[in-house]
């Protein structure tokens, strides 16, 4: 079995080698797109009014899923598609390769378009160089011109699937956060930015064998916190900030409440969506005392403040959680279906549910090939939450950016 694993990638490539028979045309570099800013219509309020009464959980923000992602090269996508038919177990482990055919703009470009929430996949790489030679590329002799040059640096890395889907707008967590912090410094009145971190520890599915992936144990979780503090500094919204003098976060959000939008402008909040790492992250830090990230906990837990509901379902559960004071993250689209009507319905439900953080692979400026896109009606960065506010408690001028 061990020998089979060692040669599985080579066998996979040999079985579908026809995919690389024809060289694709040269690709443009999506990392060099100039930043353009969305323009607010004439006559729309330019000064926040009432944001000192509006709470952070009374906003709704749209953002990108896998915010750093650049689609794999055509020959890699073709190889994966053919491999999925030859090795069904590979397809089961990695999913449909067609769902990788999307490229996001750079993070500053997305911010300029109005996105205020992002999702980053993070791998541990304390010594550097762990991801500089993707197995699939090496096996077929593909020299990827978009392989980031800074992958060899020590530190946390940002990419989708090691050895399979490695292209990224920013290869290190410090690079990604540096871009966001730089934009934030230039726009200090922006709405709070919410960043969802998925800490990845899984390698390739059986029978493939690839780059060994390091786990996020207690010391490595401390490294994550240290990198976040180094990059963002005094711009953080931390669990300590929200808890205040309350005994735990759950009590805080149901009594004192979340910070106001006014107090949150120009700041950045991090949420770790790995429920399996929650206990390790809490160890020695009850109710996240001294920690940087909010956790994916369960309803009613002491550290519960932000919850993950990837599928909006019919929207009713999310609406119930929002009414209790939680901030909820959901997805508008979990891969496009053949029917745009079906995926459009899911997006509409996600927005109507009141989930404060709605992630999509197709945000403003990046529609799918069938025209599907998730955006607010006006070119604004956020809106009053449809569940936790009413016209009497929130009007759009409270959530604009000066």
Which residue stretches match the model-derived regions?
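Bacterial N-terminal signal peptides that target proteins for export
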Residues: 1-11
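Bacterial N-terminal signal peptides
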Residues: 10-19
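C-terminal region of N-terminal signal peptides and the immediate post-cleavage residues
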Residues: 18-34
